[in-house]
Amino acid sequence: MREIISIHVGQAGTQIGNACWELYCLEHGIQPNGYMNPETASQNSDGGFSTFFSETGQGKYVPRSIYVDLEPNVIDQVRTGPYRDLFHPEQLITGKEDASNNYARGHYTVGKELVDEVTDKIRRIADNCSGLQGFLVFHSFGGGTGSGFGALLLERLAMEYTKKSKLQFSVYPAPQVSTSVVEPYNSVLTTHATLDLADCTFMVDNESCYDICRRNLDIERPSYENLNRLIAQVVSSITASLRFEGSLNVDLAEFQTNLVPYPRIHFPLVTYAPIVSAAKAFHESNSVQEITNQCFEPYNQMVKCDPRAGRYMATCLLYRGDVIPRDVQAAVTTIKAKRTIQFVDWCPTGFKIGICDRPPQHIEGSEIAKVDRAVCMLSNTTSIAEAWSRLDHKFDLMYSKRAFVHWYVGEGMEEGEFSEAREDLAALERDYEEVGQDSMEVDYMEEEY
């Protein structure tokens, strides 16, 4: 079987993890205590969920996952929450002191004490897999544990599991909404540390999710639970073809092959449709054409940037539910005919399609309406460079005054690492600029040299 291990790091990783496992359990008919719901057992006989769950001798299903945080509060809520019986106690790992929003604490001092225990637990889960496919790491760029410990853990995974896929789901600092002052430092440092280690990084920013909740779901003041349930639907769509039967299934390695033209350019933009409230759902047809068009609208994106200003290099459309390939082909042809959607000239086909037969699952009490079909689009576009330049600008403003740097140096980090990380991100911005140029332009520039 092609198993996948999910690793949830820090507060953001843990809370997104809670929403994801709640949804996976619903989709596979597994109760919060880990046992199969007898009413839905017959529907889930295909066994595809063994990619994400392992089965014990007593017929209990245990997630192939690890939760880790340097302070206990958030994971304690999992230990006492409705899904406390789902997880093995050894899968929930906590330290005693916080990373205090400091990358250096998560990466060098506090994180170092915990990393051996975590890699040991991961090894134990990996040994229980017959054909491990890879890892999904959930964390935030801005927090101390998410950025510092997340990077440290990826370094270990890269050493021990060189050939396995390593995909990240990262909460990226939003343009306006900020949860900490030093977010730009942590984000630049962790991106630099993991740039060569992760195979593919799906970014979400809270501001985009807030806007989607406000505009599409009519929630005046969205909570983190609303955001995480929205993100969980996206994660579920990306992993659905690994867990269910479908007419066009997409493997983990296929994502990379189709979405990553160069190793460093591995930050696809995530878009999901339809996101509608129950009140609006009755008035919308949600045809394949309609939901495909919605994916190219900026207001359904998970990161704030303008795709109309950039060019698409590769696009992966993952459909779920009542979808037939012919409709998809028609929708894609219409999209290609639109002049507003620009592709780079060196990638003529540009579309990878996945179709999973199982429609998205509705969570009781969730604002997202039940729909027959949905699509998640992963697109590698040059416009995401906008997000990097925004982040770099914030970094520069603080670093020009060396503000807050002493907190990092005090934890054993060298100041040179800041400028090294910043240079690496400047190079990343240039990489995006170059791949967006037409091949004719590039040839012309080379001749001039």
From Swiss-Prot:
UniProt record similarity statement:
Belongs to the tubulin family.
Q: Name one GO molecular function term.
A: hydrolase activity
Coiled coil ranges: none
Question: What function does this protein fulfil?
Answer: Tubulin is the major constituent of microtubules, a cylinder consisting of laterally associated linear protofilaments composed of alpha- and beta-tubulin heterodimers. Microtubules grow by the addition of GTP-tubulin dimers to the microtubule end, where a stabilizing cap forms. Below the cap, tubulin dimers are in GDP-bound state, owing to GTPase activity of alpha-tubulin.
Q: What's the protein here called?
A: Tubulin alpha-2 chain
Catalytic site positions: 254
Q: Where does Mg(2+) bind?
A: 71
Report the cofactors. Answer: Mg(2+)
According to UniProt, residues marked as the site described as Involved in polymerization are 449
Provide the effect of residue 356 to Y.
Answer: Temperature sensitive
Listed EC numbers: 3.6.5.-
GO cellular component terms attached to this protein's record: astral microtubule; cytoplasm; cytosol; microtubule; nucleus; spindle; spindle microtubule
Give the originating organism. Schizosaccharomyces pombe (strain 972 / ATCC 24843)
Q: Where does GTP bind?
A: 11, 71, 140, 144-145, 179, 206, 228
The alphabetized UniProt keywords are: Cytoplasm, Cytoskeleton, GTP-binding, Hydrolase, Magnesium, Metal-binding, Microtubule, Nucleotide-binding
**GO BP terms, alphabetized:** cytoplasmic microtubule organization; microtubule cytoskeleton organization; mitochondrion distribution; mitotic cell cycle; mitotic spindle organization; nuclear division; nuclear migration by microtubule mediated pushing forces
Enumerate the catalysed reactions. GTP + H2O = GDP + phosphate + H(+)
Note the subunit structure: Dimer of alpha and beta chains. A typical microtubule is a hollow water-filled tube with an outer diameter of 25 nm and an inner diameter of 15 nM. Alpha-beta heterodimers associate head-to-tail to form protofilaments running lengthwise along the microtubule wall with the beta-tubulin subunit facing the microtubule plus end conferring a structural polarity. Microtubules usually have 13 protofilaments but different protofilament numbers can be found in some organisms and specialized cells.
